[in-house]
Amino acid sequence: MTIAPDGRSLVGEVVRLDPLQDSDYDELYAALASEQVYAGGFNGGVAPASAEQMRAEWAPAVAKRFAYTVRTVADGAVVGTSSLGDVDLTNERIHLGWTGYTPSVWGTAVNPATKLLLMQHAFEDCGFGRLKIQTGLKNTRSQAAIAKLGATREGVLRRHMRQNDGTWRDTVVFSILADEWPEVRKRLEERIAG
């Protein structure tokens, strides 16, 4: 039986994922308000001008998914966000996405540790059979990171989404199936261990 995520905190050795709260936006803005973050297409490619604008733009979408604030366990610093959404219990499908990190943690164990916790929750706690991850076609850094997780590239959805700057995004879709999860989990654990 597949159940929806329950919105609880997910805690690992490297990161802690807490349900995104209204009080997190100041720290999220400080972590993510960098042109580097948005240049690859995060949040439609346009950085908000303030924490208040971020809150106003994000709140409607965040209310429709299980959004998390990513903190490092070592010092509790807010380093990003990631979410589970597009929940389809009948067809056992879920989408892991809406992920962005401060550039100082790019290439560290933060992303694999975050993905491990979210995938573990989706596959093991909730019983999903398919997890989708997608990114913009121009975001080659994210495509490489998703492929490194062990996800299968399924294809490109052309002219898929209008971005905040008015341009259209082509979207690259990847997936991981439940029977692939044990191998993906092993690879993630090895990456986190160094």
Feature annotation, model-predicted:
Residues 1-110, 121-125, 167-194:
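GNAT-family acyltransferases
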Residues 133-143:
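Conserved beta-strand-loop-alpha-helix junction that forms the acyl-donor binding cleft
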Residues 124-134:
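Conserved GNAT acetyl-CoA-binding A-motif
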Residues 134, 152-165:
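Conserved catalytic-core motifs of GNAT/GCN5-like acyltransferases
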Residues 142, 165-166:
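Short Asp/Glu-rich motifs
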